[in-house]
Amino acid sequence: MNQKFRSMKNLAGMAAVLSAGILAVSCSGAGNATGFDNPIAVQADSIAVDQIIKPSQWAMCNGKAVVVSESTDSVFYVYSLPDFGFLYAWGHRGGGPGEFPNYVRFVDSADGDTGALTLENYRGKTFDAFEVGDREMALKKTTSTFPDQTTFLESRPLFPGWLATKKVSGGKEYLYTRSSKDGSVRDSVMLYTLVKAEYDDKGNMRSLSRMNSPRIVARNDRVAVVYQNVVRVDFYRVSAEGKLELLKAVGEPLDEAVLERLRTMRSQSRQNGIMGYFSTGKYLYTLYLDLELDWETKYANILEKIVYVYDWDGRQVRAFDLEKPATDILVSGDDRLLYARNLQEDFDKVYVYNLEQ
């Protein structure tokens, strides 16, 4: 499709926010997210990073950190863990066979270390899953994305056999489960997204603006719908037949009063919401930020940075108050170490927290 689609950025898109001056998150005042216990303060160690790169995303695979770099010939920079030692750079940007476009993003980076990382291949209309080895990355599997030429779809694989797709219909956004064999829809739930869409005279979507569109994090048969503009996570179980069963909703109620607040709070300097998220086999980690944004300089003064931890049934089990400002997190598969970075700083160090201290 050649139409231009625009998604209103929230805390999860602060990189674009700080450069473009666009921010749309809820402004419910200072203090911890409503209803949560006081977090445990944790102290940071730092590890120096010698490569001069500008990360757009990071992920974890096979015990290694994988950083997607902007504006460099090499696309992926791979680091050993827990020391964050540089191993190799892999993948080149270009238009030739086996090369990558300028925009590259893992669709499952928040799922944690599952043995592979998946890119959406817009040229080939496939999801390409890569393994991360000690010396190189390798294509493991491809799955069709089943695009729709009349509208905008945001999809990602779930466990084998199923895709999760966000799609606007009738002025509302829905989460669909679809077969990865033929793209057919099995189940759907409505999302609390504020949508503004324009269509041409043939019914094809011409533009799309979304606010409060959630991130979909998946692990085994569980799916977490993580809203960033309000502090809210919905936990689902996905059956072998692709049916969605709501297990628990935690955080703010998504009522009309909350949505109306979102409509009127786009330009406030005080902002809060969920920015980072990462999962392990046991837990989902969400990074809650309370910040003061200077619209002139595009700099965000992070006042509060709390990591809330839930099990996959939606129960909050822990909460940590990070020592250093952070905008993105990774967590080791044994739930012992948390890695954090602040995209407002140069990528010359990574902060490490021992969650067992």
Language-model segments: residues:
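Structural signature of eukaryotic scaffold interfaces centered on beta-propeller domains
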Residues: 55-61, 105-113, 154-159, 205-220, ...
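Blade-loop segments of beta-propeller domains
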Residues: 85-122, 143-147, 323-327
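Short, conserved, GDST-rich strand-edge loop motifs in beta-rich repeat architectures
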Residues: 286-302, 348-353
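Beta-propeller blade signature
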Residues: 176-180, 299-315, 352-355
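Asp-box/WD-like beta-propeller blade repeats and closely related beta-sheet repeat scaffolds
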Residues: 123-126, 130-171, 191-196
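C-terminal motif of bacterial Sec signal peptides marking the signal peptidase cleavage site
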Residues: 23-26
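Beta-strand-rich domains and repeat architectures in extracellular enzymes and scaffolds
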Residues: 45-76, 282-292
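A short helix->beta-strand "capping" segment at the edge of beta-propeller domains
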Residues: 31-53, 312-315
